[in-house]
Amino acid sequence: MVSGRVQALLEQLRAQGIRDEQVLNALAAVPREKFIDEAFEHKAWENIALPIGQGQTISQPYMVARMTELLELTPQSRVLEIGTGSGYQTAILAHLVHHVCSVERIKGLQWQARRRLKQLDLHNVSTRHGDGWQGWQARAPFDAIIVTAAPPEIPTALMAQLDEGGILVLPVGDEQQFLKRVRRRGGEFIIDTVEAVRFVPLVKGELA
């Protein structure tokens, strides 16, 4: 049974143009309050971004739904997430595909996200502490790559790890950021600009 708060959020997302019912069902199935600090629990089902510490945020549900929808996932899709963060986006993906790979540069966030995912019995996720700019070459190629922080330009390593027909969805830019969708077609990459966005920067390197 979906609660009133969850139903209200889903209706708001539909009004904002989210059409993929599988994505909406995944959002309804993942308890967002489990991925944020207790002080913000009362805001868990509001359509806003919230701080999770270490200068990072949990994205607003609309942006999670929009980016996930753009990936055009099937259960068999091989998915890479750059920026595990709280693990919320990871959990949404884990409800939609058989397996998710996720890279986080901040060790403390990676550890907390793994704990939350296990508590929710989401065991179809592999997480790695590392530099998101480099992707996860050992697990490539991927059908879908999602980046939850903004690099100033599209990382070439991530484009190289896309399989034929694969889709990369990410925010790009410094002061002015735009959500981009990159699709690999043979030796070419077709890049579409979706909408203006605001994300924390994708920082190179990793933190213990």
Swiss-Prot record:
Q: Which GO terms describe its cellular component?
A: cytoplasm
Task: Indicate whether Cytoplasm appears among the record's keywords.
Answer: yes
Q: What is its main location?
A: cytoplasm
**PROSITE patterns reported in the protein's UniProt record:** PCMT
Keywords per UniProt:
Cytoplasm, Methyltransferase, S-adenosyl-L-methionine, Transferase
The UniProt record lists the EC number as: 2.1.1.77
Q: Which reaction(s) does its UniProt entry say it catalyses?
A: [protein]-L-isoaspartate + S-adenosyl-L-methionine = [protein]-L-isoaspartate alpha-methyl ester + S-adenosyl-L-homocysteine
Give the Gene Ontology MF terms in alphabetical order.
protein-L-isoaspartate (D-aspartate) O-methyltransferase activity
**What residues make up the catalytic site?**
59
Q: Where in the cell is it found?
A: Cytoplasm
Its domain of life reads Bacteria
* Key word Methyltransferase present: yes
Which regions span the lipid bilayer?
A: none
Q: Which Gene3D superfamilies match?
A: Vaccinia Virus protein VP39
Single GO BP term: protein modification process
Tell me which family the UniProt entry assigns to this protein: Belongs to the methyltransferase superfamily. L-isoaspartyl/D-aspartyl protein methyltransferase family.
Per its UniProt record, what PANTHER family does this chain match?
A: PROTEIN-L-ISOASPARTATE O-METHYLTRANSFERASE (PTHR11579), PROTEIN-L-ISOASPARTATE(D-ASPARTATE) O-METHYLTRANSFERASE (PTHR11579:SF0)
What HAMAP family does the record point to? PIMT
The protein's job, in short, is: Catalyzes the methyl esterification of L-isoaspartyl residues in peptides and proteins that result from spontaneous decomposition of normal L-aspartyl and L-asparaginyl residues. It plays a role in the repair and/or degradation of damaged proteins.
Q: What is this protein called?
A: Protein-L-isoaspartate O-methyltransferase
